[in-house]
Amino acid sequence: MSIVMQLQDVAESTRLGPLSGEVRAGEILHLVGPNGAGKSTLLARMAGMTSGKGSIQFAGQPLEAWSATKLALHRAYLSQQQTPPFAMPVWHYLTLHQHDKTRTELLNDVAGALALDDKLGRSTNQLSGGEWQRVRLAAVVLQITPQANPAGQLLLLDEPMNSLDVAQQSALDKILSALCQQGLAIVMSSHDLNHTLRHAHRAWLLKGGKMLASGRREEVLTPPNLAQAYGMNFRRLDIEGHRMLILTI
């Protein structure tokens, strides 16, 4: 798989790094670790929203060399929960994120997959927290999906599962898997280690802004690594053919 993004000695004051790594096309990479590990800081840096020490190459070019307009065509970024910036119909908000605004069928498909069919005419400031999160997710998917944006390469998601129920999380997993199969690179933060063990291809385990481990999910999410990150003891079990992590007392 080709390298989409290369990080070299990336650091930000006392909050992050230095750390290095690479993001590959057609894979889902999870950032895991305790609160304050630096996951959100790292995602914002990878999105080009902040600057600091070290270097990031995106599609073979320095990240800082990308204009905001061009960057928005090649990568999409979902930050942590935000309130709607202003009131407008959901369909209008989603349309603003589409590069090809004639693809109304795609908008309807993505909205339907995230159970937003009956919310398209509602104002963004009249949504619940979970509804707004799904609208935001639909927006970044529409922005970057190769179906309508052949230039799309990278999707960055900061705790995308927040405020989603089990069915909605499953729906999002299906969408992300489909995007991955179309060649998109996906990087997302997660607090659900078992979800990472099931759905990520690779993982970066962070603590205190440092990278404790990186590699295939099974190699990273080991009891010794997790004990070092969280200060708690874990066991990894096989239950009906699925691996699962549990805390031990």
From Swiss-Prot:
Subcellular location: Cell inner membrane
One GO cellular component term noted in the UniProt record for this chain: plasma membrane
Family according to the record: Belongs to the ABC transporter superfamily. Vitamin B12 importer (TC 3.A.1.13.1) family.
Domain of life: Bacteria
UniProt keyword annotations, A-Z: ATP-binding, Cell inner membrane, Cell membrane, Membrane, Nucleotide-binding, Translocase, Transport
The EC number(s) this enzyme carries: 7.6.2.8
Protein name: Vitamin B12 import ATP-binding protein BtuD
Keyword Transmembrane: no
